[in-house]
């Protein structure tokens, strides 16, 4: 009985470890892809646990990072946790389908898994297109690199008038980069 519980527990930790490594791979891939410059104006859609937020705000000197998340609780939690280290970053409550910023505010927008889970992805992509400056870049990460999902997102981005689409693959995840 004890061996059975230990076996189940070790399976859990193996799965957790694999998921954690994949998450870190995706986060590093996104940060590398964005190529953060000190004066960038960046929008993060979905703050997650705040690790990418912290990494980016450390690199920005004159620029800014704004993050929106649909969870009010998460916005409060991340704001409190990073109160001293916010630097050039701010966290707001908001949805990808209704981004609370003016047209052409950001030169870079990125999403780690959040846009995929929104209720109307076409509306979310339209909003992202609206807040991006001309020649601004949108970065979206996708968990699996299945061809069907990749083709679907590329077509959705093309339908919203994004151009110069490129795909960056690493491990079992990919990042699609699109230009306004």
From Swiss-Prot:
GO terms for biological process: methylation. It is an enzyme of class 2 (transferase). Keywords: Methyltransferase, Stress response, Transferase. The keyword Nucleotidyltransferase does not apply. GO terms for molecular function: methyltransferase activity; S-adenosylmethionine-dependent methyltransferase activity. Induction: By the natural cationic antimicrobial peptide LL-37 and the synthetic cationic antimicrobial peptide poly-L-lysine (PLL). Its EC number is 2.1.1.-. The keyword Transferase applies. InterPro entries: Methyltransf_11, SAM-dependent_MTases_sf. Belongs to the methyltransferase superfamily. This is Putative methyltransferase YrhH.
């Amino acid at each position: 009985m004890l061996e059975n519980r230990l076996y189940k527990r070790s399976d859990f930790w193996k799965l957790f470890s694999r998921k954690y490594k994949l998450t870190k791979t995706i986060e590093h891939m996104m940060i590398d892809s964005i190529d953060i410059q000190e004066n960038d104006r960046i929008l993060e859609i979905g703050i997650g646990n705040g690790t990418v937020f912290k990494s980016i705000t450390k690199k920005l000197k004159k620029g800014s990072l704004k993050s929106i998340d649909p969870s009010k609780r998460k916005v409060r939690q991340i704001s409190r946790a990073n109160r001293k280290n916010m630097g050039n970053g701010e966290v707001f409550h908001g949805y990808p389908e209704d981004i609370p910023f003016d047209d052409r505010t950001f030169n870079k927008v990125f999403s780690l898994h959040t846009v995929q889970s929104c209720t109307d992805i076409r509306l979310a992509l339209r909003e992202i297109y609206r807040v991006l400056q001309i020649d601004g870049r949108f970065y979206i990460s996708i968990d699996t690199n299945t061809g069907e999902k990749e083709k679907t997102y590329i077509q959705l981005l093309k339908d919203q008038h994004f151009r110069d689409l490129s795909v960056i693959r690493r491990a079992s995840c990919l990042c699609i980069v699109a230009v306004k």
